[in-house]
A protein has these predicted regions:
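Helix-helix packing/entry segments at the starts of transmembrane helices
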Residues: 85-91, 164-180, 215-247
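C-terminal transmembrane-helix exit sites in multi-pass transporters
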Residues: 44, 75, 93-117, 192, ...
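Loop-to-transmembrane-helix transition segments
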Residues: 1-4, 43-72, 141-150, 195-213
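Transmembrane alpha-helices of multi-pass small-molecule transport proteins
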Residues: 21-68, 153-157, 176-191
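Hydrophobic/small/kink-forming positions within alpha-helical transmembrane segments
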Residues: 6-10, 41, 63, 67-71, ...
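Juxtamembrane helix-entry segments on the extracytoplasmic side of multipass membrane proteins
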Residues: 22, 30, 52-55, 128-152, ...
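Cytoplasmic-side transmembrane-helix entry/capping segments in multi-pass membrane proteins
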Residues: 1-3, 54-65, 108-121, 140-144, ...
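Juxtamembrane helix-loop boundary signature in multi-pass membrane transporters
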Residues: 1-2, 97-148, 152, 166, ...
Length: 287
């Protein structure tokens, strides 16, 4: 699980690096998706399952939502301090809880509702210094909204994965994500694609490879340990993101960011410990 958290943190850091090198977000997503499609097809062939699955409408919806959410997440990675952008992603349990209650009739516990309140307080503490000026920075506000939108999209994707988990192989669920991303990025952004230099290609390939390493490590961890423990350890990604932001992007988290992060982490970890074990496969498929 430590390897998974480190791999996903490295992936996000490379996204930020690639964006800083002038590589368009659509191109970053395209390369990531091409690598994911190739590796997913290998896994599906070994599993001897049909690559298109059974509930193709829901699978396509899961891929589409994931694509939109990924655009928002990558924009936040590039524009916000890396640790802060990563922290916003861990607000997705709030949205997942609300969506699961509405669409799946899963009633949240009092502990979960308390965690949501604590996480919202943490979000308020984290962003308050940026909003107290007469004219908050528009780029920051847009990136903040993108980060929140990415968390919402992740919540929707989690809910769809939960709906699909009873009938679809995890590799098929994962496959639909990059299957949507490849044509969508070509249609929407191919004219902006550039030919990167060596550093750019290294960053792009690293994004794809670290994504797969993170997924494989996460899946393996969830096969041998409990959902609460593995999910809790996944929050180490935030710590790794803070370290990478400090080492490579000269980003030092403010006291407000640290205080807000502490509250969000508290809410997320307690919520994870209260979740049933069947979320193992859901979490792995979502990543």
């Amino acid at each position: 699980m430590l390897l998974s958290a480190l791999a996903f943190a490295a992936m996000g850091g490379l996204v930020k690096l690639a964006g800083g090198l002038g590589i368009p977000i659509m191109q970053i997503i395209f390369v990531r998706a091409v690598i994911s499609v190739a590796l997913c097809l290998v896994a599906i062939r070994r599993a001897h399952v049909h690559p298109l699955g059974q509930r193709r409408g829901l699978l396509l919806a899961r891929g589409t939502v994931g694509f939109v959410a990924l655009i928002a997440v990558f924009y936040a990675f590039i524009q916000l301090p890396y640790a802060q952008a990563t922290m916003l992603q861990y607000l997705h349990p709030l949205f997942t809880t609300a969506l699961a209650f509405y669409f799946l009739a899963e009633r949240p516990t009092l502990a979960t509702l308390g965690c949501i309140v604590v996480s919202l307080l943490g979000l308020g503490v984290m962003v308050s210094p940026y909003l107290q000026t007469d004219m908050p920075d528009r780029t920051y506000l847009l990136a903040l909204l993108a980060g929140l939108g990415g968390a919402l999209g992740s919540g929707v994707a989690y809910t769809l994965v939960r709906k699909l988990a009873s009938s679809e192989h995890p590799s098929v669920i994962v496959l639909y994500f990059p299957m949507v991303c490849v044509p969508a990025t070509l249609i929407l952004g191919v004219r902006e694609f550039i030919w990167p230099d060596l550093a750019g290609w290294t960053a792009l390939l690293g994004v794809g490879l670290f994504t797969q390493l993170g997924q494989l490590s996460l899946t393996r961890a969830m096969q041998v340990d409990s959902a609460s423990r593995t999910t809790s350890l996944s929050y180490l990604q935030i710590v790794f993101a803070a370290v990478l932001g400090w080492l490579f992007f000269n980003e030092i988290p403010s006291s407000a960011t640290l205080a807000g992060a502490g509250l969000i982490l508290l809410g997320a970890v307690v919520s994870a410990w209260n979740q049933p074990s069947r979320q193992n496969s859901d979490h792995a498929a979502q990543k």
